[in-house]
Amino acid sequence: MKQDIYINIKAFDCSLLEECVRKFIDELKRSSAKLSGPIALPRKDSKFIVNRSPHVDKKSREQFEMRTSRRLIVLHDLTPTMMQMLTGLSFSAGVEVDLKVKEVKEVKV
């Protein structure tokens, strides 16, 4: 069975995200890995509305927005050296990296 790694990268700052993705792809190309991506996933927008004053004036409100940008990289044919390299990478604060390993069954026709 083959194993694929799905790498989800999330960040609030788009420039930080692109720098992290570039770093990932450069490291993976050095190890001659087969990969798909980076695939741009939809941006998540969260809006928060709060009252400006603590007691009165319900009409006076403030709006805040939080945007989360995401990218997906799929690594095919995982090797132990690739896994060590992936876990050894360090990224700047504000970037969240999730690794998921899935087994792919080969179908013979």
From Swiss-Prot:
It comes from Wolbachia pipientis wMel. Involved in the binding of tRNA to the ribosomes. Part of the 30S ribosomal subunit. It comes from the Bacteria. Pfam families: Ribosomal_S10. NCBIfam families: PRK00596.1 (NF001861), rpsJ_bact (TIGR01049). GO terms for molecular function: structural constituent of ribosome; tRNA binding. The keyword Disulfide bond does not apply. GO terms for biological process: translation. This is Small ribosomal subunit protein uS10. Belongs to the universal ribosomal protein uS10 family. Keywords: Ribonucleoprotein, Ribosomal protein. GO terms for cellular component: ribonucleoprotein complex; ribosome. The gene is rpsJ.
